[in-house]
Swiss-Prot record:
The keyword Transcription regulation does not apply. Its EC number is 3.1.1.96. A motif (Gly-cisPro motif, important for rejection of L-amino acids) lies at residues 137-138. GO terms for molecular function: D-tyrosyl-tRNA(Tyr) deacylase activity; Gly-tRNA(Ala) deacylase activity; Ser(Gly)-tRNA(Ala) hydrolase activity; tRNA binding. Belongs to the DTD family. It comes from Lactobacillus acidophilus (strain ATCC 700396 / NCK56 / N2 / NCFM). This is D-aminoacyl-tRNA deacylase.
Length: 145
């Protein structure tokens, strides 16, 4: 599993000109599920993200979690995160888990975050989406599990 975590002031995802997900301060998560991932990996990723302290405290240190700042989550599935670019010029996506299992695991991931008390908005699995955001920092982390 690979998750790109972007600290944002706000973010939204549109499909066919209609907003389907919209958050204020929080995390934009771009989520890639790979072959071999299972519920234990999903739970570990959700737990790590829930506890990640990348918001600044009153002293300017990255010491606060998403929960500490009452942040929200926008989760967007993105199989292209699993691209292999080692050979040639065309990325290979054989590492990416195929639907419907990848969709189920992405939905389970979002439920885990909701169960941790977060407001979670999502894109639509497999759709052509337009994602807009205002980075805060920018502060971006790639979580590989």
């Amino acid at each position: 599993m690979r998750v790109v975590i972007q600290r944002v002031n706000h973010a939204q995802v549109d499909i066919d000109g209609k907003t389907v997900g919209n958050i204020g301060k929080g995390f934009l998560l771009l989520v890639g599920i790979k072959n071999g991932d299972d519920l234990s990996v999903i739970k570990k990723a959700a737990d790590k993200i829930a506890k990640m302290r990348i918001f600044e405290d009153e002293e300017g240190k990255t010491n606060l979690s998403l929960k500490d700042v009452n942040g929200e989550i926008l989760s967007v599935s993105q199989f292209t995160l699993m691209a292999n670019t080692k050979k040639g010029n065309r990325p290979s996506f054989v590492e990416a888990m195929r639907p419907p299992m990848s969709k189920e695991l992405w939905e389970d991931f979002n439920k885990e975050l909701e169960n941790d008390g977060f407001h979670v908005e999502t894109g639509e699995f497999g759709a052509d989406m337009k994602v807009s955001l205002e980075n805060d920092g920018p502060f971006t982390i790639v979580l590989d599990l």
